[in-house]
Amino acid sequence: MSWFTPELIEILISVLKAVVILLVVVTCGAFMSFGERRLLGLFQNRYGPNRVGWGGSLQLVADMIKMFFKEDWVPRFSDRAIFTLAPVIAFTSLLLSFAIVPVSPTWAVADLNIGILFFLMMAGLAVYAVLFAGWSSNNKYSLLGAMRASAQTLSYEVFLGLSLMGVVAQAGSFNMQDIVNSQEHVWNVIPQFFGFVTFAIAGVAVCHRHPFDQPEAEQELADGYHIEYSGMKFGLFFVGEYIGIVTVSALIVTLFFGGWQGPFLPPFIWFALKTAFFMVMFILIRASLPRPRYDQVMSFGWKVCLPLTLLNLLATAAVILYNAQ
């Protein structure tokens, strides 16, 4: 009896697809750091990294080698186990968040019926990594940064979840494939424009990206909750942040811009082009907006984003009830 049954072959193909997708995501997250530095250089009328390799193309490799050989230092009075666990949780939770995103009609790591809930669960798990990093470092700046990050993330995750409820109500499913298929005629960005705006803002805040990078503000907290990290532990936080940008960009495309749908080109090409556009938008936002105060960030969330998401949800419910009559 052969070991290679049709069921086993199907499982191996699914595992291979998952490995390929996740490796591509990690690679995109790593290369985005180089792309960001080049784009910021152009935006600020300077060159950016252009010495290592042709046009600076090997700068990322040089940074990886440098980071790999840096001393993996642990503070003397820190909680070593939790200090080591924090970057692993951060990297893993952000990477697994991409698992529910369908790259094409046949390519996805996991086709879950509760796909959106899985993403929100992974986003909530990432908060523990920040808290663990701040608490275990035994550093006042790390702890202050962790407290800022946890309060900001938990607050904006409320708006993140509520902004998606209109999309779920229209599609009638939490499954990402069903949501993409429901946009065959009209992308969700048109009927769910306020939901899209709120989701994009909350996505930037949850990723702790500028202008919502108060937990890592160098001028105030000296890099916040990962001030004590070095070597590959810092590298996991660093790459994890860019993986978060890739994931949020991919979710914006999937939920509001038709996912892989588009004329002429193959589905995965359309998905990649749309996702790359929003990744560039993340970078341009960093280049063009100032950093507000922390109290202004929290006030904006509860006084602007929350009413906007509730208004969008009420309007969506009213339209669905009207069409059902």
From Swiss-Prot:
BP-aspect Gene Ontology terms: aerobic respiration
Subcellular location: Cell inner membrane
Intrachain S-S bonds: none
Tree of life domain: Bacteria
GO CC term, one of those recorded: plasma membrane
Chief location of this protein within or outside the cell: membrane
Membrane topology: Multi-pass membrane protein
Endpoints of the signal sequence: none
EC numbers for this chain: 7.1.1.-
Listed transmembrane segments: 11-31, 81-101, 114-134, 154-174, 186-206, 237-257, 265-285, 304-324
Family stated for the protein in its record: Belongs to the complex I subunit 1 family.
HAMAP family named among the record's database cross-references: NDH1_NuoH
Subunit organization: NDH-1 is composed of 13 different subunits. Subunits NuoA, H, J, K, L, M, N constitute the membrane sector of the complex.
Name of the molecule in the record: NADH-quinone oxidoreductase subunit H
Biological source species: Yersinia enterocolitica serotype O:8 / biotype 1B (strain NCTC 13174 / 8081)
